[in-house]
Amino acid sequence: MALSERIVIVDDERAVRSGLSNLLHSDGYSTRLFESGEALLSDDDALSEVGMLIIDVGLKGMSGFELFTILKQRAGLPPVIFISADLEETTLWYAIALGAVTFLRKPIDVDTLLTLIRCELSQGKVR
């Protein structure tokens, strides 16, 4: 597996983190899991050799959008997919306006998620 196939998942719900991690492992990806934006930012190696981030918008503490804004200031930010149970259209459009690959509503359609990840990683994009 290429190192760019490591995916970071940031979600405050343990079941979501583990479910996504299991799904991605079964498709050949490695994962790093964080329960908050603060936890990710406090780990100096969190984004080392990462191909993609999946970030929940509604994190406790720092929101997913706040985390993305901080990460965007760093060089070499990998592609980001936002996820949320929020049904507001404005949330979707804000995620896209910030520069995310896309926004997926929970519960997440796993086929859509895997297709997006495969497409993005095959393009080797770094934002």
Question: What are these model-predicted stretches?
Answer:
Residues 35-36, 63-66:
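Acidic catalytic/metal-coordinating carboxylates
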Residues 66, 87-102:
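Alpha4 helix (beta4-alpha4-beta5 surface) of REC/receiver domains from two-component response regulators
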Residues 57-60, 88:
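The feature encodes the CheY-like receiver
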Residues 33-52:
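Acidic, metal-coordinating helix/loop segments flanking the phosphotransfer/catalytic sites
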